[in-house]
Amino acid sequence: MKPTQAILAEILDEVRPLIGQGKVADYIPALARVSNQKLAIAVYTNEGEVIQAGDADEAFSVQSISKALSLTLAMVLYKPEEIWQRVGKEPSGQAFNSMIQLEMEHGIPRNPFINAGAIVVADLLQSRLSAPRHRLLEFVRQLSGDTHIVYDKVVAASEMMHSDRNAAIAYLMRSFGNFENDVIPVLNNYFHACALKMTCVDLAKTFSYLANKGVSVQTKKEIITPVQTKQLNALLATCGLYDGAGEFAYRVGMPGKSGVGGGIIAIVPGEMTIAVWSPELDASGNSLAGTQALELLSERIGRSIF
């Protein structure tokens, strides 16, 4: 079965009672102010069709979803060994901002989607691009077809003011020789990436290349190779949802990436990209109602990579 607007609207109605059972991220004040009632889903097919329900045209802070986009840019700019000698490909099983494992493993982060790994990717981008922030924004605008996408300066400033732990992570990696640039500019770029404001429709369009062997459905251009696409989807399936990746694979069965803004992107290779948004999070930092919506959609349309 193919997804329809009626199916999407029905799913949102079914998951709405979960609102009130999760917790909106409050360690970033600007995120804590977002209404917990927001609920959205959008599907972008490989034929270029958009199907949506709920608040799918309302922009929100994508947070860690941007880590998959930053990694995509790094994969374009670097040889594989240049990336993977500095960051691993394994699930961490730890909280996304944990430092214990990083110390034990000599400053090499487990994967590119926990904070430490994403900060290494930001460091890689800083080394190769004169204006990483501008390049990422340009990249996202092209992939989504939405020239109005911006960084939320309030969120970025808020994250910079509460950056002690991420700065500690960066300096710890530098002490092990796994950092090339000044920490503060790299963190600033990292926080701006997290502060991208996008809608579910924007996100579904932006990530269409992961459902289409590396070719953007929106621009018809190859972003990464089919092999790189397979590799990135594998990392999303194993590491994309913090320490809830196994649970997500079990329930939803799609490569995905979540953010503490309440968004999740999910990929059905060869067919479609799905974005959901509900700001309340579960204990792992993943959208509570969003995960349930993806599980229901996976069941209704009979799609899973497993």
Curated annotation (Swiss-Prot):
Binding, substrate:
64, 115, 159, 166, 190, 242, 260
Gene3D superfamilies, per the entry: DD-peptidase/beta-lactamase superfamily
Which organism encodes this protein? Vibrio atlanticus (strain LGP32) (Vibrio splendidus (strain Mel32))
Gene designation per UniProt? glsA
Q: Which residues form a coiled coil?
A: none
Q: Which family does it belong to?
A: Belongs to the glutaminase family.
NCBIfam families, alphabetically? Answer: Gln_ase, PRK00971.1-1, PRK00971.1-2
Q: Quote the catalytic activity from the record.
A: L-glutamine + H2O = L-glutamate + NH4(+)
Question: Which GO biological process categories is it annotated with?
Answer: glutamate biosynthetic process; glutamine catabolic process
Q: Does the keyword Hydrolase apply?
A: yes
What is this protein called in UniProt? Answer: Glutaminase
List the Pfam families hit by this protein, alphabetically.
Answer: Glutaminase (PF04960)
* Molecular-function GO term, any one: glutaminase activity
- Positions of transmembrane segments: none
- Superkingdom of the source? Bacteria
Top class in the EC scheme: hydrolase
User: Which key words are in the record?
Assistant: Hydrolase
Describe its partners and assembly state: Homotetramer.
Query: Which InterPro entries does the record match to this protein?
Result: Beta-lactam/transpept-like (IPR012338), Glutaminase (IPR015868)
Q: What is its EC number?
A: 3.5.1.2
